[in-house]
């Protein structure tokens, strides 16, 4: 059984990211994979290492600040989780959390401008294009890892 954690489901859900979890449920059901999804947020007792997959969506700046403060108590667990090759999917500004907490090796820099628009990506994982939308005011710098996607249209 796959144990999934939708972390900060209530306040990091700016663009209806709960639909990403529903899409994941649909795909797992279609493949007849057994899973359990827990929904946790601020003030919940969270045992990061109990999960096989963690998802964090996009939030407003106010929500981001609350989550950043809350995640500090899980920093070492998140580092171990990643070192153990477990999976975390973040969308939008949730990626910036891992820079601000210095969990991953990149720098997220806030800019005076916003990047808004649709993007088209390719990846070696699937044959089809991946289409997404960005509305952000941060730029990723000093990133030394191999990106998951290659941007074919838009800014990324």
Regions found by a protein language model. Give the residues of each.
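N-terminal beta1-alpha1 cap of cysteine-dependent amidohydrolase-like domains
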Residues: 1-76, 80
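A structural micro-motif
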Residues: 2, 35, 86, 128-130
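Generic secondary-structure signature for well-ordered alpha-helical cores
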Residues: 29-33, 106, 140
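Short, well-ordered coil/turn elements that cap or connect secondary structure elements
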Residues: 32-34, 83, 127, 143
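Cysteine-nucleophile active-site neighborhood
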Residues: 60-127
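Amide-donor transfer/coupling interface in amidating biosynthetic enzymes
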Residues: 108-156
